[in-house]
Amino acid sequence: MALKDRFDKIISYFDTDDVSENEVHEVQERTSVQRDSRAATAQEASQRSHMTNSAEEEMIGSRPRTYTYDPNRQERQRVQRDNAYQQATPRVQNKDSVRQQREQVTIALKYPRKYEDAQEIVDLLIVNECVLIDFQYMLDAQARRCLDYIDGASRVLYGSLQKVGSSMFLLTPANVMVDIEEMNIPKTGQETSFDFDMKRR
């Protein structure tokens, strides 16, 4: 009976749109019935405390179990779930972060044709992307200006700019390490020479 009353209370809590006076009286009657049932269960509990252990075991075996509401139980369960989640989460986050680091490293290949393309290259560095820049479609003077702008931006953003070919440079953010050994770059017929230090000859 008490369980049914609890369900009725829960349902009536959500059904407040069509409240009428009859329902208010019904709720008051239910409340008085609940008080009576609580008093009856309290009397039964006091009677059970006076019985012997064997009689009590027989009575428990013949009646269905009743559960008492513990307001702190939900809080304890929530805390236990949170603790279990926090203990399991660092391991998962570490594995996920390694996967994300492997997946997030991308290299964009850019062939700038005019000086204004340098801003697009720097924007890629800002979002932590590596950029391989090939200046083969630019004139020497424009390429020097563009390279100077990109080099300045990479220093401000703590990136690095490295020469990897006769007209190619690799621009990397601070979190990417590049290990380039001495490379002998063969002359491919392009007579343009781009110097990393931007010295004029």
From Swiss-Prot:
UniProt superkingdom: Bacteria
Subcellular localization(s) per the UniProt record: Cytoplasm
Compositionally biased tracts (Polar residues): 43-54, 83-92
Listed InterPro entries: Cell_div_SepF, Cell_div_SepF/SepF-rel, SepF-like_sf
SS bond list: none
Keyword annotations from UniProtKB, A to Z: Cell cycle, Cell division, Cytoplasm, Septation
Comp. bias (Basic and acidic residues): 27-38, 72-81
A Pfam family the protein falls into: SepF
Listed GO CC annotations: cytoplasm
Region (Disordered): 27-99
Keyword Cytoplasm attributed: yes
A biological process term (GO) from this entry: FtsZ-dependent cytokinesis
Keyword Cytoplasm: yes
Free-text function comment from the UniProt entry: Cell division protein that is part of the divisome complex and is recruited early to the Z-ring. Probably stimulates Z-ring formation, perhaps through the cross-linking of FtsZ protofilaments. Its function overlaps with FtsA.
Family indicated by similarity: Belongs to the SepF family.
HAMAP family for this protein: SepF (MF_01197)
Summary of subunit composition and partner proteins: Homodimer. Interacts with FtsZ.
Protein name: Cell division protein SepF
